[in-house]
C-alpha cells in the first residue's frame, strides 16, 4: 500500500539532516518501517528541486509518483537493504524507485529482495563513448553531410526498425552472448568488449526467461536508437581536467572528436520488466512481503520469481550491449564513408560503455567486512576505483571511466571512479542531468521550433525523427548538469576527467 503518512512541510523537514554541503541524511521515521537511513548527494541549488516537490506533496498528497525523497525512504524500508538508500544529485521521481537511486541488498539475508522498479523499464539503458583521431576542424566543412549520414545509417525514432539481420535463433544467441555475439558476427572489434562494463556480457542471462512477447518486440529493434532521451552525438573535447586519465582513454587534446551513443534495450527490456512486475505482485502475498508503495513490487532474491527476473534482466542487458555495439558498427561505417577512410585509420576505438539501469551481484565492504550484495542502480552509474579487478587493464591506475550525458545541446562529461565512492556509494555516481519537470509540462511550456533554433544558434547540427518530441528533452526540462557533476566531484564519489561539447545531435 502507498505510504499514507502526510505531514506538514516543516514536520517533513525535521527528518532531513544536513551532513555537509553536499550530503543530506533522511532519517528513520520519515516513512514507516525504514531499515536504514537515506543519504542524498545534493548541493543547495539541486536541493531546492527536492524540497519544492516535497512541499507540494505535503499540501496536496499523492499525485502521480511520490516525491523523490519519499521514494528514497521507501526503498530504505525494503527487506535486506544495507548501508543507505542512496540518492545521486540527478535524482527525480520515477516508478517505485526514484531515478538516481542506488540500493544494495545482502545476499546472505534470506529475506533480501530484487525489485524491477530498482532497475527501471529500460534495462541497461546506457552510454558508450568512442574516440577518433579527428579534430573539430576536420569535421566542420562536412558537418551537415556527416550528420545526415549518421541519421541515414542509424535507425532512430519510436517505431524504428534495425538493419542488422536478425531472426529468433540469432536473437536468442544475442540475448545469451551479448557483445560476444556481435564479435562472432563481425560487428565488433576484439578490444571493444574489453572496454564494456561486464565485458558486454552478463553470464547469468537465460533467453528462456524472456517472454515471446518481449522477443517479438525486440526482434526488429536491434541496432536502433529509439526515442525519448536517447541520442547519438558527435562531440568535441572541450576541457581536460585529468590529463593522466584522459591519456589512458586516448584523449590527448582539446578539439578532438568523440562520439557518444545513448540507448538501451528498447521494447524487449520494457516487456521483461512488465512481465516480472506482474508475477512479483502475485508472489508478494505468498512470501508475506509488505510494502509502503506497491510500485516497489519485488521478490526474494532466491525465489523462483527473483531468479527468473535476474536471468531475464541479464538477457535484456545483453540485448542492450548488442544494440549499442550494432550502432557502433553503423557509426563507424558512416564516418568511414564521410572521410573516405576506414574506422581503424580514424582510430574509432571504444573508450568505455556503461550501464545506467541494472542490478548486479558485487562484492563490497559492509561494516568492515566483504559481502556479496545485489546492487540496484537506477539512473546511476557504476564508478569503480583504481585497482579494482573488474575494470580493464588500461584503467587500473586511473579508475573506471564514467560516462555522463548532458542534456540536448549541453556538455557531457567523463568521470573516473574513486575509493571514497567504493566505501560510500557501492562504487556508484550520477548518470546525467536529471529531469527538473515532467515531459508533459515540457511539451506545454516549450515550442519545438524554439528548441531547434536554439541548438542551431549554438552551432549544433541536428537531425530528429520526431521534432515535436524535442521539447521533452530540451535543456530547460533538466537540472544543470554542471551542478550535478560538481556535486559528485565535491563529495568525492567520482572525479572529473574530461568535458565534451556537442556539435551534432541525432535523436529519435
UniProtKB/Swiss-Prot annotation:
Signal sequence, start to end: none
Catalytic activity line of the entry: a 3'-end 3'-phospho-ribonucleotide-RNA + a 5'-end dephospho-ribonucleoside-RNA + GTP = a ribonucleotidyl-ribonucleotide-RNA + GMP + diphosphate; a 3'-end 2',3'-cyclophospho-ribonucleotide-RNA + a 5'-end dephospho-ribonucleoside-RNA + GTP + H2O = a ribonucleotidyl-ribonucleotide-RNA + GMP + diphosphate + H(+)
GO molecular function term, any single one: metal ion binding
GO terms for biological process, alphabetical: response to bacterium; tRNA splicing, via endonucleolytic cleavage and ligation
Residues annotated to bind GMP: 229-233, 356-357, 405-408, 412, 431-434, 507
Coiled coil spans: none
Co-factor binding comment: Binds 2 manganese ions per subunit.
Cofactor annotation: Mn(2+)
Keyword list, A-Z: GTP-binding, Ligase, Manganese, Metal-binding, Nucleotide-binding, tRNA processing
Misc note: Ligation probably proceeds through 3 nucleotidyl transfer steps, with 2',3'-cyclic phosphate termini being hydrolyzed to 3'-P termini in a step that precedes 3'-P activation with GMP. In the first nucleotidyl transfer step, RTCB reacts with GTP to form a covalent RTCB-histidine-GMP intermediate with release of PPi; in the second step, the GMP moiety is transferred to the RNA 3'-P; in the third step, the 5'-OH from the opposite RNA strand attacks the activated 3'-P to form a 3',5'-phosphodiester bond and release GMP.
Quaternary assembly: Catalytic component of the tRNA-splicing ligase complex.
Reported function: Catalytic subunit of the tRNA-splicing ligase complex that acts by directly joining spliced tRNA halves to mature-sized tRNAs by incorporating the precursor-derived splice junction phosphate into the mature tRNA as a canonical 3',5'-phosphodiester. May act as an RNA ligase with broad substrate specificity, and may function toward other RNAs.
Family of this protein: Belongs to the RtcB family.
Record-given protein name: RNA-splicing ligase RtcB homolog
Organism: Dictyostelium discoideum
